[in-house]
Curated annotation (Swiss-Prot):
Binding residue positions for ATP: 496-503, 1104-1111
Transmembrane feature ranges: 40-60, 124-144, 172-192, 250-270, 271-291, 364-384, 397-417, 748-768, 796-816, 864-882, 888-907, 973-993, 1002-1022
CC per GO annotation: plasma membrane
Protein's recorded name: ABC-type transporter MYCGRDRAFT_41235
SUPFAM superfamilies: ABC transporter transmembrane region, P-loop containing nucleoside triphosphate hydrolases
Glycan attachment points: 121, 481
Domain (ABC transporter) ranges: 460-684, 1070-1334
Region Disordered: start-end pairs: 687-720, 1191-1223
GO MF annotations in UniProt: ABC-type transporter activity; ATP binding; ATP hydrolysis activity
Primary residence: membrane
Length: 1353
């Protein structure tokens, strides 16, 4: 067995003596395979005491477990089994819904939420309810134990009376027998309780995994638009599976307490009346008054939880958006704006959390104090009625009242958990009730055509759920009266302006829109590739093969066709290189080519490509088009949406769409010969821009060995050894630093000080109260009247209630402060982390920290700490009280407490590591669900949906193993600790009986009543301490983000104020001196000694092949990495001495992929509110945003797999959808389900750059995915607004920059190969620029003509 993991050396006080080292042992079988959990095959003894876990715990004490050796769950507990049961019951219940749905009933048991609840119950019916029966037996055994307490006290009374009367005392064996019987009764209850909770907790595990599996399966059947319609965006689904499903899991563990506790209370009422007669009714009358208030509190807690969920969802959505758009956030220095938004939502969430914590404190105080106050009232009434306080009756009744604390404490928790579970079921019910869509057009292999559409109308509708109180807004788009016949083997191209419906048309062919009328059928299965490439976490090979059969010949052919062979040769592990979430470590062109390779890897008779070549430069585009399009198999039908005019002449037929209708269709020659035709107008207007590219495509073949030059800079990947970081795993005990950090976050000077004072008041009253009752019964102070006894006893009871209320309330503030501080520190640290952190960390992992782990801090860990401190106080009080009466108990309890501690120490390493493994295996579930939903259209089109669903089940089964074993280990500990508790009862019982000649019956009653009441507290204390250490994993993970995530250089520096006053940079001159730059530590430099001077007001174009360092130059300029040597000067100021906030705000940046954030258009343009509306409207007019309809391009959503519109229909057409309302500054924008097309997003990106009015303007391939018309319009806007400003442009179309640039900088292998005017560089024979122009088909005359056009425009 590998010993790669080992605990740090243990301190002597953390070691369990007399244990041999088991680190060399393994849980694997002789063949090295994982075993099925031995629970089912265990002997009755091992099953009863959970001893089948002994090997697991023994090894876990010696060394950390690893996931690959843990027991597997049996096939009967597989996720597929219970997911199938759940789905079957849901469908069965849906079929039995009566006509009208039962809406007239007061309780509609056929509502979606009730159906889901009943289906959950039916899925685990026998296992769950046998656990309930066991819990009932345990509760009855516990609540009837005072009968034996009374019998023992009677025995003491009889012994005392007979001894005084000189009569023979009862046989001591009789007393010992009753003490043993009391212990056995409690022991039987312990065993039933442990197994009852085991079944309840594991039922939660089974239902949790079944819910996640079923929810993922159902939502994966929806398109992004359909999910938006049902309010099931990706962030909300992640919230559901991380929070709501976990609450149902938690509710299962405590559900049975909601009814068994009531039975306990009723039995207690009967027994108390039997002891105290009618006087008991006064105590229970007080309970009848106070306990219902708990129900109101629980209801209000439920309401508060419900109110907080929208804020939680909004916070998680804001975090997800910030992470997804982190490059935009960085280059615009928007961290503080996003932090402010997230903090506002968190504060709203915390206000409700504070109210919940204080209400919970009142509830806890009531639950614990009501029995005490009821006992006070009952005993005072009993005495006031003239009854003599009989020790047997009084102390058995006191035991009953004190035992009521457990059900009364448990009831609020149980009802709260049930309320949370009910709330979660209501939130989940909508997803489970949504009708499953029927995706895909019918396929008929017998038809002649590849695609046949006749008189069809297709549409989608998106509902806006942003404001649940208002009427839901619906946006829609339609393609009407479509009649399209695509022949088999045909190259069919689709063109059109913005809002024309090109992407919607492709989406309809893969079943992502709704066919309203008409007829549509496919002749074969279709493979689809969107324009915005989607990749999954994994290796490049995994992304291309995508779970399909391995075919090396086909694979190599696909790599060659997509020009990936040269790229793979530069990667450290070739095609086994891990590329990260959505291929974040690849350039844009590389991502697109990998996605295209995946689409064509398995030959398909019908290919649907949505403008997939726009992100490629001319060279690579030419070769890929040649091999993928022009040299495709003769029988392959290719439908291509394109903005590249030079490709149109290769089409067999072209379809021109406009405003959702087919405007014209025919061959290239036919459409060019049509006077006044749409396509002829566009081609004649913009053909000159693509002439060079057209010539290049005609050439067909490229020179051998020419590396790809598509957009983006892949240099950061060439030396990468591990692109995605594995999630950190903590080993060993939770450090003192972790506990100290958590305590410091809770403002301990205030909270802990007052907590200790209130705990002393509470515990003092708890110890003195039974002693005073004893003295009252014995008449210890003859001078005191009965009324005085009553008054003091009542005062002690009230002091307990006040002390407990203060203690719980103050600790509620501690939880509130710590939750507030930990979240604030973690999110600040993450947002200010360098971009390399996000390149190597899956976003799903980060969002999991801020969902599941924050939920644990808000609702679990603090409460666990409070309960631990309370139990410690109770244990100390119990030991003190019983030792006053029975000094020998101190010696016995010392031995047993040592056993308690050693048992806990033996258990904790295994429990801690299992919980950590559970957390580590849980993150991949969220990551897989998130990235799969983002790419669901691609997954479905490739027929990989079932593989994706199977992977999710595999992840769930993997996580269920440590989770189930963790629960089982808790029961292993509970059995042993609670049996030790019964040993304490037995010891006290035997000592009391054995000391009958030296103690009074009242003293014996105090000792017995107290030990029976608190015996479980001893075990609970150890168990709670272990549970806290297990749950501290959430604190560890968030503190890691708070303190250990690397941070960017300071965003603010002392000299920034002076630069602001000087309005730096006024000119925009840039100078780079010997700059060496790397994207992150451990990588080879991407820039190697760069020297470059950019005069103020100069327009410079960066060109070069892939990996040459173009994008890296821009990253260095805005501080998106580490400059390890050299300096960058802007207007004579070293940028390393400037705060990143000022630096990035003073450089206007327009990235290739335009991103938006949820909020208003005003928020997207100016999140800090630095500009007035007049300025914002001015830039909106300049870029054309003010004339855009708010819904004009929602149709482009169908082409994206990422719940955001694709960069498809990028041009802006004000005429489209003129009936819609125009964009205003207050128009709401949704990042995930935006109504904006990619073109509109690009214009927003341009507007937010222009509003800065910066002297330096940077465009990083900003027009790569735009059509000719929008590109032309954008260039005109830039020329008009950027005169006199320093402009740096990266462009993959060389002809688009040679005419407009004053200087050309040619990058090669991280160095400046050439820099000068276009004509000067072209004149250098053998130079890099001359070579690039030659490869692009550009000659000297082309450069002259391009410059002439720019100057004259």
């Amino acid at each position: 067995m590998s010993k790669s993991l080992a605990y740090p050396p243990r301190k002597w006080y953390r070691r369990v003596p007399f244990l041999s080292d088991k680190s060399s042992l393994t849980l694997l079988d002789s063949n090295g395979n994982r075993k099925i959990t031995p629970e089912a095959s265990a002997s009755l003894w091992n099953w009863f005491f959970f001893s089948w876990l002994n090997p697991l715990i023994a090894i876990g004490y010696s060394r950390p477990h690893i996931q690959s050796e843990l027991y597997l769950l049996p096939p009967s507990s597989d996720v597929s089994v219970y997911a199938g049961k759940l789905d079957g019951h849901i469908e069965g219940l849906r079929e039995r819904v009566p006509e009208g749905g039962g809406k007239r009933r007061r309780f509609n048991f056929h509502s979606p939420s009730w159906r889901l609840a009943r289906a959950l119950n039916a899925s685990v019916l026998v296992w769950f309810w046998v656990g309930g029966a066991m819990k009932l037996f345990a509760d009855v055994a516990t609540i009837t134990s005072p009968l034996l307490v009374r019998a023992i006290i009677r025995f003491l009374q009889t012994s005392e009376q007979n001894r005084k009367a000189g009569l023979p005392e009862p046989s001591i064996g009789q007393g010992f027998g009753m003490a043993i019987g009391l212990a056995l009764l409690l022991a039987s209850g312990v065993m039933a309780n442990v197994h009852g909770f085991y079944r309840s907790y594991t039922s939660g595990i089974l239902l949790r995994s079944a819910l996640i599996d079923s929810l993922f399966r159902r939502t994966s059947a929806f398109s992004p638009l359909e999910r938006a319609k049902h309010n099931l965006e990706t962030s909300r689904i992640i919230s559901m599976i991380s929070t709501d499903v976990s609450r149902i899991d938690f509710a299962c563990g405590y559900f049975h307490a909601t009814w068994t506790s009531v039975i306990q209370i009723l039995i207690c009422l009967g027994l108390t009346i039997a002891s105290l007669g009618p006087a008991a009714l006064t105590g229970f009358g007080l309970m009848a008054i106070l306990v219902p208030s708990q129900n109101y509190i629980v209801k209000y807690l439920f309401l508060l939880r419900k109110r907080s969920m929208p804020f939680t969802d909004a916070r998680l959505s804001a975090i997800s958006e910030a992470l997804a758009s982190i490059r935009l956030v960085k280059v615009y220095a928007w961290e503080s704006a996003l932090l402010s938004k997230i903090s506002f939502l968190r504060r709203s969430e915390l206000k409700l959390l504070r109210s919940r914590l204080l209400l919970r404190a009142v509830n806890v105080a009531l639950s614990f104090s009501v029995p005490t106050l009821a006992a006070v009232v009952s005993f005072v009434t009993y005495a006031a009625l003239g009854n003599e306080l009989d020790a047997a009756e009084v102390f058995s009744a006191l035991t009953l009242f004190m035992l009521l604390r457990t059900p009364l404490l448990l009831l609020p928790v149980a009802f709260g958990a049930a309320a949370d579970g009910a709330n979660a079921i209501q939130r989940l019910a909508g997803a489970f009730d949504a009708p499953m869509p029927d995706h895909g057009l019918p396929i008929d292999g017998d038809i002649e055509a590849a695609v046949e559409v006749k008189d069809a109308t297709v549409s989608y509708r998106v509902q806006d759920h942003s404001d649940e109180k208002s009427e839901k807004q619906t946006s829609s788009f339609q393609l009407t009266n479509l009649t399209v016949h695509i022949n088999r083997g045909e190259l069919f191209m689709i063109v059109g302006p913005v809002g024309a419906g090109k992407s919607t048309f492709l989406g309809s062919l893969v079943g992502e829109t709704r066919l309203e009328t008409g007829h549509a059928v496919l002749g074969s299965r279709a493979a689809y590739a969107p324009q915005q490439a989607w990749l999954k976490s994994g290796s490049i090979r995994e992304n291309i093969v995508f779970g399909r059969p391995w075919n090396p010949d086909r694979y190599n052919s696909v790599l060659s066709a997509c020009c990936l062979t040269q790229d793979l040769s530069t990667f450290p592990s070739g095609d086994e290189t891990m590329i990260g979430e959505n291929g974040i470590s690849l350039s844009g062109g590389q991502r697109q080519r990998v996605a295209l390779a995946r689409t064509i890897y398995e030959p398909s008779p019908l290919l649907l490509l949505d403008d997939v070549f726009s992100a490629l430069d001319a060279h690579v585009q030419s070769e890929v088009v040649q091999k993928v399009v022009l040299e495709r198999d003769p029988g392959t039908t290719l439908v291509l949406v394109t903005h590249s005019l030079h490709l149109l002449r290769h089409a067999d037929r072209i379809c021109c769409l406009n405003e959702g209708r087919v405007e014209e269709m025919g061959s290239f020659a036919e459409l060019m010969g049509k006077e006044g035709g749409q396509m002829r107008r566009v081609v004649e207007e913009f053909a000159s821009k693509s002439s060079a590219e057209e010539e290049e495509v005609e050439d067909g073949d490229l020179k051998d060995g020419v590396p790809s030059t598509d957009g983006g800079d892949a240099s950061q990947t060439t030396s990468n050894k591990a692109m995605m970081q594995t999630e950190e795993r903590f080993i060993g005990s939770v450090t003192a630093r972790t506990y100290a950090s958590y305590i410091r976050a809770g403002k301990p000077a205030f909270t802990l000080t007052f907590f200790i004072l209130s705990m002393l008041i509470f515990q003092g009253g708890s110890i003195l109260s039974p002693l005073w009752l004893q003295w009252w019964q014995e008449g210890r102070f003859p001078t005191l009247s009965s009324g005085t006894y009553m008054g003091v006893y009542a005062a002690l009871g009230v002091s307990q209630a006040i002390g407990l209320l203060a203690m719980s309330s103050i600790f509620g503030f501690f939880i509130f402060y710590s939750a507030c501080q930990i979240h604030a520190d973690a999110i600040r640290s993450v947002l200010y982390a360098p971009i390399s952190f996000f390149d190597t960390t899956p976003l799903g992992r980060i969002t999991h920290r801020f969902s599941k782990d924050i939920d644990a801090i808000d609702n679990v860990i603090g409460e666990a700490f409070r309960m631990l401190l309370s139990t410690v106080a109770q244990v100390v009080g119990a030991v003190v009280l019983i030792s006053i009466i029975l000094p020998w108990f101190l010696l016995a309890v010392f031995v047993i407490v040592i056993l308690y501690i050693l048992t806990g120490m033996y258990y904790r390493p295994t429990a801690r590591e299992l919980r950590r493994l559970d957390a580590l295996t849980r993150s991949p579930i969220y990551e897989h669900v998130s990235e799969s939903l983002n790419g669901i259209m691609v997954i479905r089109s490739l027929g990989a949906l079932q593989t994706t669903l199977d992977r999710n089940r595999e992840n769930l089964n993997t996580e269920n193993s440590p989770y189930w074993l963790s629960v089982a280990c808790q029961r292993w500990l509970s059995v042993r600790l609670d049996l030790l508790g019964t040993c304490l009862v037995l010891l006290v019982g035997l000592i009391v009986v054995g000391s009958r000649s030296s103690i009074s019956a009242a003293q014996g009653g105090v000792a017995l009543s107290y030990i029976v009441t608190v015996q479980a507290v001893f075990g609970f204390m150890i168990r709670q301490s272990a549970e806290i250490e297990n749950n501290m994993n959430a604190i560890e993970r968030l503190l890691y983000y708070s303190h250990d995530v690397p941070q960017e250089p300071p965003h603010k520096r002392e000299g920034d104020v002076g630069l602001v006053e000087k309005k730096w940079p006024g000119q925009g001159a840039i100078e780079m001196r010997d700059v060496v730059f790397t994207h992150r530590e451990g990588l080879e430099p991407s820039l190697r000694g760069v020297n470059l001077v950019i005069p103020a007001g100069c327009r410079l174009a960066l060109v070069g092949r892939t990996g040459s360092g173009k994008s890296t130059m821009l990253a260095a300029l805005v501080g998106m990495g580490e400059i390890t040597a050299g300096t960058i000067m802007v207007d004579g100021v070293d940028v390393s001495t400037i705060g990143l906030n000022l630096l990035r705000k003073r450089i206007a940046f327009m990235p290739q992929e335009a991103a938006v954030l949820s909020g208003t258009l005003r928020y997207n343009l100016d999140p800090f509110g630095e500009h007035d509306d007049a300025d914002l409207w001015r830039v909106m007019h300049q870029v054309g945003l003010s004339s855009i309809s708010a819904q004009s391009s929602a149709e482009t959503l169908t082409s994206s797999d990422q719940e955001k519109s694709s960069p498809d229909d990028a041009a802006i057409s004000p005429s489209s959808h003129s009936h819609s309302q125009h964009l205003t500054l207050d128009t709401p924008i949704h990042a995930e389900r935006s109504d904006l097309s990619s073109g509109q997003r690009s214009l927003i990106s341009l507007a937010r750059a222009l509003i800065k009015d910066a002297s330096i303007f940077v465009l990083d391939e900003a027009t790569a995915s735009m059509d000719m018309e929008l590109d032309h319009r954008l260039q005109r806007v830039l020329r008009e607004n950027l005169r006199g400003k320093t402009t740096i442009v990266i462009a993959h179309r060389l002809d688009s920059v040679v005419g407009s640039s004053d200087l050309i900088c040619v990058m090669d292998e991280g160095r400046v190969a050439q820099c000068g005017s276009p004509m000067d560089l072209f004149g250098e024979e053998g130079g890099h620029f001359r070579s690039l122009c030659s490869d692009a088909g550009l000659g000297e005359l082309d450069l002259v003509e391009a410059r002439r056009r720019f100057v004259s425009s």
